[in-house]
From Swiss-Prot:
Annotated gene: BHLH60
Lineage of origin: Eukaryota, Viridiplantae, Streptophyta, Embryophyta, Tracheophyta
Identification of the protein by name: Transcription factor bHLH60
A GO term from the CC aspect: nucleus
Coiled coil residues, start to end: none
Gene3D superfamilies reported in the protein's UniProt record: Helix-loop-helix DNA-binding domain (4.10.280.10)
Subunit organization: Homodimer.
InterPro entries hit by this protein: bHLH_dom, bHLH_ZIP_TF, HLH_DNA-bd_sf
């Protein structure tokens, strides 16, 4: 019976496919038992220590087997003269032969057992059970479990990858979030830059009830126009002033009174009436709606200039009727404006200088007529006497009938004035 051949055949069959652990353990136990029982030692005496470790029945059988083998060797030497060497010699001690196949199977068996005990996870293989007789066998034993470990690692890695979410998805989600954050931050930066780039003024005027930027160019230009027109109006009418009412509207106060003139024996009173912005908008003489304080001031200036022209025309007509009377309108207007600016807003008649001069001239004329003898009596003495003289004779007791006075004070709002504001008193 060739044990080595059987061992080789069995080991070749075990390489590709692994048998169950129970069967391999049984086979290994039988093989070890056969080796111990069938292979006697060369020196039975030297193997006595080994026999002590065996059961008593096996030790007796081994002793009887050595006796029979020695008799057979003597017969063989007598026939052939040469003693064949034993198959396996223990070398005086009970030692196992160096069978490479058996060692490989034992190492494989130990590796499989440890892998199953560790749950197919550990990557280290125990090499203490492998004897240190052959280095090549150790290399083979080390390489084989390394392959199994790598395969098991691959399997475990695949399972872990199936369980753990893919990091690429997380990276993509993170990149998307970062991109969205960057987009939001960029939009915020753009908004802030646009706000910084905005000019510090507003070109369009705010509506009524809304605040306007006092530092805007449009507001500055508007105020400059208003101030320029106000200065021009103050030059035309020295007593005018600008103010605001409770509603915030700008009102113009023109401080000159009513002028009383007598033309062809009739009193002529010129009034300057108070007009507000609403009256200006609803005026019939200006169909288009006029908006803006500067435009209103322009209309006021035009109306004041027209009134001044009318006064000049009336004074010229009065001078043509009676050239001896010097009205001196400039001094009259200056005195009236000064008195009104001082606060005399009581509509009381103001006595002027020219009626006194007129009365003095009339008295001197009558005195000269009385001193000179009448050379010729005119039939129409009334024609030589001026008209205002006759009226004075008729109303001799009333001293204040021929005086120019101011009837009321005038408050003009920021509006144009109606052109037909000349009232004739009969």
């Amino acid at each position: 019976m060739d044990l080595t051949g059987g061992f080789g055949a069995r080991s070749g069959g075990v390489g590709p496919c692994r048998e169950p652990i129970g069967l391999e353990s049984l086979h290994l136990g039988d093989e070890f038992r056969q080796l111990v029982t069938t292979l006697p030692p060369e020196n039975p005496g030297g193997s006595f220590t080994a026999l002590l470790e065996l059961p008593p029945t096996q030790a007796v059988e081994l002793l009887h087997f050595t006796d029979s083998s020695s008799s057979q060797q003597a017969a063989v030497t007598g026939i052939g003269g040469e003693i064949p060497p034993p198959l396996h010699s223990f070398g005086g001690t009970l030692a196992f032969p160096s069978n490479s196949v058996l060692m490989e199977r034992a190492a494989r068996f130990s590796v499989i057992a440890t892998e199953q005990q560790n749950g197919n996870i550990s990557g280290e293989t125990p090499t203490s059970s492998v004897p240190s007789n052959s280095s090549a066998n150790l290399d083979r034993v080390k390489t084989e479990p390394a392959e199994t470990d790598s395969s098991q690692r691959l399997i475990s890695d695949s399972a872990i990858e199936n369980q753990i979410p893919c990091p690429n998805q997380n990276n993509r989600n993170g990149k998307r979030k970062d991109f969205e954050k960057k987009g939001k931050s960029s939009t915020k930066k753009n908004k802030s830059s646009e706000e910084n780039e905005k000019l510090p003024y507003v070109h369009v005027r705010a509506r009524r009830g809304q605040a306007t930027d006092s530092h805007s160019l449009a507001e500055r230009a508007r105020r400059e126009k208003i101030n320029a027109r106000m200065k021009l109006l103050q030059e035309l009418v020295p007593g005018c002033d600008k103010g605001t009412d409770f509603g915030g509207k700008i009102k113009i106060k023109v401080c000159f009174g009513v002028h009383l003139l007598m033309i062809s024996g009739k009193k002529v009173a010129i009034f300057l009436w108070k007009v507000s912005c609403e009256d200006l908008i609803d005026c019939s003489f200006s169909p288009p709606r006029i908006q803006g304080t500067a435009l209103v001031l322009d209309e006021i200036i035009n109306h004041v200039q027209s009134l001044q022209r009318q006064v000049e025309m009336l004074s010229m007509r009065l001078a043509a009727v009676n050239p001896r009377i010097d009205f001196n309108l400039d001094t009259i207007l200056a005195s009236e404006n000064g008195s009104l600016m001082d606060g005399s807003f009581n509509a009381a008649p103001m006595q002027l200088a020219w009626p006194q001069q007129a009365i003095e001239t009339e008295q001197s004329f009558h005195h000269r007529q009385l001193q000179q003898p009448p050379t010729q009596q005119w039939p129409f003495d009334g024609l030589n006497q001026p008209v205002w003289g006759r009226e004075e004779d008729q109303a001799h007791g009333n001293d204040n009938s021929n005086l120019m006075a101011v009837s009321e004070n005038v408050m003009v709002a920021s509006a144009n004035l109606h052109p037909n504001q000349v009232k004739m008193e009969l």
